[in-house]
């Protein structure tokens, strides 16, 4: 579903372009395959689905519970796509494109293996210190504009695989940490509006935080994701409130702020009530 929304957003905002869309996964249900076919037919674009054998990736670490080793597939994509193209744009499945994608694909890579956006300054400071990166730079690998020949020349896939079996305590994340250790800042850095949050002017939204728009709508970017879901072949979703548990008190603060901006006073007061109650419960140690 998430992939379908990402692709729908790209195609809706780039109707003048022809695409070859390559989808890499470790498995796919019949329902999702049927929906993908519907997506291809609706937009008259070419789709290719790769169901990957994950055995070669089993020695890579899994750092967080909601991740899987599928994140490491991006490290072998250049070898698979090499007979088909010189360059390609890699995107995570938790993204939205809200404008002209050629803003990215027209970028001159200047001899670098790929272009990517930096993490936030706070994340860069933490990550570069944790990973002992000499460059002081750290990119997000959720979107990469890749030159396959340069990637191959620098043997990036092979260098990534050299980290198989490494002590997981060396890393705070997964493929992104390894990619940054391999490149250590030697890429073309592009504006964060091409891999960003909800700032004005963002071209590519990236929902890489703990709150996901397919779980709940907490801001305008989440609502935009639901809009593209409605345009896709996948079923629309209800918009439930966050659970009324102390751990979710801050989500009610976000809802309160959004309601205030939209001048929905009744909703604002409702969310203020639950924000206050749940925050008190959290301080009292109630579950």
Language model feature labels by segment:
Residues 1-14:
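Histidine-anchored nucleotide/phosphate-binding helix
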Residues 8, 34-37, 83, 98-109, ...:
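Short alpha-helix within the catalytic core of nucleotide-sugar-dependent glycosyltransferases
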Residues 19-27, 116-118:
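Short internal beta-strands
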Residues 31-80:
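Active-site-proximal specificity loops/subdomain of glycosyltransferases
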Residues 88:
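Short aromatic/hydrophobic "clamp" motif used to bind/position activated sugar donors
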Residues 91:
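Catalytic metal- and UDP-sugar-binding loop of GT-A-like glycosyltransferases, i.e.
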Residues 95-129:
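Conserved donor-nucleotide/metal-binding helix-loop-beta segment in metal-dependent transferases, i.e.
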Residues 146-287:
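A glycosyltransferase accessory/donor-loop signature
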